[in-house]
Amino acid sequence: MKKINNNKIFVLFLTILLYLLNITTAQKPVSINIKIFDQLPLYNDNFGSQSRAATIKSMVATSLNTTFKTPSLGSATSSLPSPQLFQYWFQSNFANETKNSGLNAPLTRTITLNYDSDSGNYIFNNPNFFLIDTDGFDKTASNRIYKDSTGTYHNYHYCVAFNYVFKPDGQGKEMFKFTGNDDVWVFVNNKLLLDGGGVRSPEATTVDFTKAGLVKSQETPLDFFYCERSTNSPPSFKIETNLGGLYCKAYDYCGVCNGDGGTCCNPQTDCLTQLENGTLINDKCTIPICPPLDTQIDKNLGIGFFCQHSQIPDPYAGSLCEKGECDSLTGIWTRNTSICPTDKDLAPQCRKQATCDPKLGCQSTYLCNNVCDIGTCNNGTCTQKTSNDCVQELDRGVEDKCFTYKCVPNVGCSKTPICPRGTDPCKNYTCSGGICGTVDIPQSECSCPCPGLNKCNTRICNPDNTCTLFNLTEINDGNPCTDDLCDPVTGDITHVMTTRCSGCNTCDVKTGKCVAQDSHCDDGNPCTDNACVASANSTANSQVGQCTQTPTAKCDLGDKCMVYSCTLEGGCNATQRVCPNSGACKIGYCEPGFGCKLKDRVCSSDWYCIEAQCDAKYGCIQFDRRCAPDNSKCQEGVCVNNTAIGKNDGKCISEDYDPKPFVCQKAALVSTAVIASVVVVGAVVLGAAIFAGKKGYDAWKTSQGNVMAASQANPLYTQSSNGGENPLYNSPT
């Protein structure tokens, strides 16, 4: 067996002593899941080989966007080549691969903050914070163009964010310090408390928690944002904090804390197919969308199965006279103006196409508005007025047997005597009950000279042998809406519809007055209200009617919780109003008589130690209740469910760390007894190590049971992580 060097024995003893002391003070490390957004200067020229300068304040707004948990751009933007692209520093953007499109590559990593017993803080320190070399955009070898001073390639351009929460212990000693180069912002309670924007050299900055408005045991968000934008020096990244109780409340389906799904779902590549009737198809007329963040993804089906697809907006929308049609295979839109039915389509309805109004839609002309039409259509044929209709119209339904009734096209109903008038001026031609007759007129009454006598009138001789002329009674057809005419040479009688009423006005055969006929304005569109109104061209002797069409109001029945609509094909429709939500935590509902309102989304948990909240991004979430201890250095908060009383009953308690951390023990207890016991144990271990080597140490450790449960490895036989020499790494022989 080799001789043991005294120096090595001393180092061994010291190592054991320090290690055992560390056992009593060790705390669990804090793991933080970070979001990384790889940036390429081609797509976002705010990143590149920029010169370092002083810290820039007010690059971001002082309040955090509480829905997306991202900072908003502030007032100091002059140093940014493209301020509009700031929105893509900390959220996924799957844009086109074009200059300054804002395209980024979302990634995720986990960093571990180890407990430092000297300071009582948790620390992560990496002076060469190159976490995503050959990842993100740099998976493509041609993008690996940035190198450090030694010529070694690195991925320099990226942003980091994490959104965690903690519960203050009420001691007022919270601390969070960051040391690094380029941009860093930290928000506490959604307030900007660390403002370090700009491409700059590494410097230490500390959060001022006195401005955070902390309340003991109250859930408090801490949101961290960092960017490495230059290649002038390696990215330095160090976090030091005493917030050992940092935790994440919600993870997306990619497993990222407060993620947006971007690390495992790119809609341009993962959502190209959709489910239709049980078959996955690729429809280029839809916009692929990654699943909602609260979706439970079945890994056997793949994320694409849960993607959503919304229709690409019709580029020709806005006019009721045209629409776009999209080819699902090519995604190419074509314009279709064949919206309205053709004359052939309308013929069975006795209509013909008139025009199309972009706001009102298709309009047609009704062909059964002639004066001899009764206004109904029978399979494409207008129903004509019969003689009975004319009796009703002219004589209120009482037929005069001495006349024939008929409707003359473009003239209307008229009646003519059934008994013809003869040429003998000394006979009076009569009709009674439909029977024609004559009555002789004395010569003295019919043979007098009568200048102006023609075939359209008759005469009566006066005692002084003069005559009086009268128009033939049959000239008047009894219709006040016709102009009655008689040819004085031939005696032919004609009746012409009056021109006093025109347009959509018609003449009332009972009164002779012009009446507006709204039915004559029917455009065949159930979604318009049609009216006949007086035209500006009307005069006292000529009443001109003009048709107007307006969007119909007859569909709206006044119920504020119904949505009324109208279609050319179906007319009026009514559907239940769906009130939109406002974000993930405000639920829309409809209150009768009022309309849409919002109410808080209610999230519940059956157990006290499982908290339920509504998150503005995820909706209802559940997570373990974290309890703030009375003294975070010496105690941990523990949640206890009281199942004996009920599921929702429980409490938070503070329990001392066991074993109690060295700094928390009373001086009197820590002095001689503790040190002595440590020395004794150390001596035992030292002896085991010297005389039995590694196996002796391991056997001793096993015999101690739970006493050494906190030990993670044998410190004597673990190679130093920093390259230094472990004096007893090799077993003595």
From Swiss-Prot:
Extracellular side: 27-672
GO BP: any one term: sexual reproduction
Lipid bilayer topology: Single-pass type I membrane protein
One Pfam match: PA14
Presence of the UniProt keyword Membrane in the record: yes
Database matches in InterPro entries: Fibro_Slime, PA14/GLEYA, PA14_dom, Prespore-cell_inducing_factor
Glycosylation sites recorded in the entry for this protein: 22, 65, 96, 277, 336, 379, 428, 471, 537, 573, 641
Keyword ATP-binding in record: no
Cytoplasmic side: 694-733
Residues that span the membrane, as ranges: 673-693
Record-level GO cellular component terms: extracellular matrix; extracellular region; membrane
Residues of the signal peptide: 1-26
Subcellular localization(s) per the UniProt record: Membrane
Main localization category: membrane
Domain PA14: 114-260
Alphabetized NCBIfam families for the sequence: Fibro_Slime
Family the UniProt entry places it in: Belongs to the prespore-cell-inducing factor family.
Protein name, as recorded: Protein psiM
